[in-house]
């Protein structure tokens, strides 16, 4: 008699995805972040659901409802800070996950990679709308500034902005619809993640060497279930450390002031995980140009499969491109720092140079270094 997990229609899917899945025997801890993202998503949906039970999406009561959650709801402060800092952990895992994909050439799985890019946009949209909900100063002005960028779209821009706002400014209608979208998007993200996995399991996982690993596969359970479990414990430990000791470390003090349309904060800036894109946006003096650069800063990932010139898939044995990769990582840290600084000298010029370097490395230098490495190894 066959095992129920191999014959039952539903258990069979779970079995092929998490138990008997043939997995390369040499994948490192950098491959843990996919499962960690899944844990982050589940955590965000659960904490978000409990927050939604007590939150009111009305401009007059939104701010005080968040204060009420923290003061009067049992462990409300814990749920609120787990949700807020859980978003930060989500993005840390997301950036590492994408970075690993870039380093080891996982973008050659085109369908998986493109679904991943769509997922990234969806997660960013969700996080942005979630930041608006507490209705503090930075929530209001962040929403105003970022939605206003759409007015740069020729012809339909201004109408589009008013349509998104549901009026002539960010107001009650905007907050209500942002809450509705913030609630529904994580479930869409969960569905997209399933599609992401579906496409991944069509090809099988990549591995650090970038070589075909069909001859050396091991079952996912117990090897990688245990390995993922360790990652999850460390993730929850890091989140607990952040939530219980430094809950406001990554937040903005301005968001503890209720939203006031008549008083602009001195420095309007988004959450830390958007600062690199915000720095790229600000480094271009033209509004439309800035918006295009902002979108391209993420959309450029879709070009990676076409910009791959090397005969090798992974960067493991490619020292020149490896160096460029780490320069790119350092550049992203620089952009993140610049995004949080005021618009004045020398930050403006540093931001512009860092933005030029970001696009140059991906579009020009990495493809050239791939060619050079082929020549050195006489692979042409």
From Swiss-Prot:
It holds the Pfam family Cytochrom_B_C. Heme b b562 binds at residues 83, 182. It is found in: Mitochondrion inner membrane. A ubiquinone binds at residue 201. One of its GO terms (biological process) is mitochondrial electron transport, ubiquinol to cytochrome c. One of its GO terms (cellular component) is respiratory chain complex III. Binds 2 heme b groups non-covalently. Component of the ubiquinol-cytochrome c reductase complex (complex III or cytochrome b-c1 complex) that is part of the mitochondrial respiratory chain. The b-c1 complex mediates electron transfer from ubiquinol to cytochrome c. Contributes to the generation of a proton gradient across the mitochondrial membrane that is then used for ATP synthesis. This is Cytochrome b. The gene is MT-CYB.
């Amino acid at each position: 008699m066959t095992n129920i997990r191999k014959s039952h229609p539903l258990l069979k899917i779970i079995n092929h995805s998490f138990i008997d899945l043939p997995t390369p025997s040499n994948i490192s801890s950098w491959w843990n972040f996919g499962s960690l993202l899944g844990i982050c998503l589940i955590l965000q949906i659960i904490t978000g659901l409990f927050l939604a039970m007590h939150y009111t999406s009305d401009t007059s009561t939104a701010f005080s409802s968040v204060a009420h959650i923290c003061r009067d709801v049992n462990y409300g402060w814990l749920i609120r800070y787990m949700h807020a800092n859980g978003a930060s952990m989500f993005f840390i895992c997301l950036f590492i996950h994408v970075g690993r994909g870039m380093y080891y050439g996982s973008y050659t799985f085109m369908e998986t990679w493109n679904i991943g890019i769509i997922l990234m946009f969806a997660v960013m949209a969700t996080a942005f709308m979630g930041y608006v909900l507490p209705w503090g100063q930075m929530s209001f002005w962040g929403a105003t500034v970022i939605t206003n960028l759409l007015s740069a779209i020729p012809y339909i821009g201004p109408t589009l902005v008013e349509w998104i706002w549901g009026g002539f400014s960010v107001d009650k209608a905007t907050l209500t619809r942002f809450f509705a979208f913030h609630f529904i998007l994580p479930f869409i993200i969960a569905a997209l993640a399933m599609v992401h996995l579906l496409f991944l399991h069509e090809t099988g996982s990549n591995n650090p060497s970038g070589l075909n690993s069909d001859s050396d596969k091991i079952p996912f359970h117990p090897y990688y279930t245990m390995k993922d479990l360790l990652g999850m414990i460390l993730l929850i430990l890091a989140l607990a450390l952040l939530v219980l000791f430094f809950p406001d470390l990554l937040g903005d003090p301005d968001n503890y002031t209720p939203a006031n349309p008549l008083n602009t904060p001195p420095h309007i800036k988004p959450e830390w995980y958007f600062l690199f894109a915000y720095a790229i946006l600000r480094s271009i003096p033209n509004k439309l140009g800035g918006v295009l650069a902002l979108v391209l800063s993420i959309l450029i990932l879709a070009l990676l499969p076409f910009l791959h010139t090397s005969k090798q898939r992974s960067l493991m044995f490619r020292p020149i491109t490896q160096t460029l990769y780490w320069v790119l990582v350092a550049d992203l840290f620089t952009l993140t720092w610049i995004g949080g600084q005021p618009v004045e000298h020398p930050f403006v010029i540093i931001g512009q140079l860092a933005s030029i370097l970001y696009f140059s490395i991906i579009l020009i230098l990495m493809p050239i270094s791939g060619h050079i490495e082929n020549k050195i190894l006489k692979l042409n």
